[in-house]
Design a protein with these regions (language model features):
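GST-like domain detector, emphasizing the conserved glutathione-binding G-site
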Residues: 1-141, 253-254
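C-terminal or late-domain output modules
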Residues: 3-8, 14, 23, 31, ...
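Non-transmembrane alpha-helical segments in soluble domains
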Residues: 17, 75, 79, 99-102, ...
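A general structural signal marking secondary-structure boundaries and capping sites
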Residues: 82, 178-181, 230, 239
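A short, terminal or domain-edge coil/loop segment
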Residues: 86-95, 141-154, 234-250
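Short flexible/disordered coil segments
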Residues: 97-100, 124-130, 174-178, 182, ...
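GST-like fold's C-terminal all-alpha helical module
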Residues: 109-221
Length: 258
């Protein structure tokens, strides 16, 4: 049976939870708290790919002893490997659009949402801990870029205003794509919508002036349609804290190319 190592249903952690709920598939849930660095504990599933994945602390699928990381790949795997509704579009062009959106939003929106979430919610959590012990834990994190991402949160080295500005282009692109269309990749709800929803929905809390019914009416309508899906409600109901929107860890490294 598929095992899913996951945390609160928010951000990238939400994606496979929605997909599994849409499929109605049984799986073994392995909850871990990345803010307690449980992902670095001996015996935690890992391989070369998971250690270097762009999403850093994201969820892992374990299938037959193999570890699958990176949530856009996980979504495609689950769609093909698990019985249930087909969430991949029919046409080649719409399938291309699923992958194009995943790449664009993963690199263009994922880092922004993660940075804003960490600045607002994770930094106070880290600041309340013993500084010496915490820095000793962070010093052991490899690779260096992964360690620096945690240190940036702890040290408050996040320019929230600059990150807010970086929302403009991807949000405008989404709003334009949803003008006259219900879904992102063809006439039906698909993996593209699951992938994007997990990154866009938190902006209602993190950047309400950017994503709202007045400024982005088509995007707001799309979010509302997905909010109502039983699978999405079921995934969100898995929260242990009752506040999944406050659950953030450093995510995808920002693009080096702007």
């Amino acid at each position: 049976m598929i095992a899913l190592c996951h945390w609160e249903p928010n951000g990238v952690f939400l994606k496979p939870l929605i997909a599994l709920a849409e499929k109605g598939a049984p799986y073994n849930s392995h909850w871990f708290d990345p803010t307690a660095f449980e992902q670095f504990a001996p015996g935690f599933p890992a391989n070369a790919e998971s250690a270097l994945q762009l999403e850093r602390e994201g969820p892992l699928l374990v299938v037959g002893g193999e570890v699958l990381s990176s949530t856009s790949f996980q979504l495609e795997y689950l769609n093909e490997a698990v019985a249930g509704p087909d969430l991949f579009p029919v046409t080649a062009h719409d399938r291309y659009r699923v992958r194009a959106w995943a790449q664009y939003l993963g690199l263009g929106l994922g880092p922004v949402v993660s940075a804003l979430g960490c600045a607002r919610f994770l930094r106070p959590v880290l600041a309340a801990r013993d500084g010496g012990a915490l820095r000793a834990q962070l010093a052991a994190i490899e690779p260096l870029e992964r360690r620096h991402a945690w240190l940036a949160v702890l040290d408050g080295a996040v320019d929230e205003a600059a990150w807010q500005q970086r929302l403009a282009v991807p949000v405008a692109r989404l709003e334009k794509a949803l003008t006259g269309a219900d879904w992102l990749a063809g006439p039906a709800y698909s993996l593209a919508d699951i992938d994007a929803y997990a990154l866009v929905a938190p902006l209602r809390t993190l950047a309400p002036a950017v994503v709202n019914a007045v400024t982005t009416p088509h995007l707001a309508g799309w979010l509302a349609r997905i909010d109502e899906r039983p699978a999405v409600r079921a995934a969100l109901a898995l929260s242990r804290s009752g506040q999944p929107e406050a659950a953030w860890v450093p995510g995808t490294e920002p693009s080096r190319w702007g």
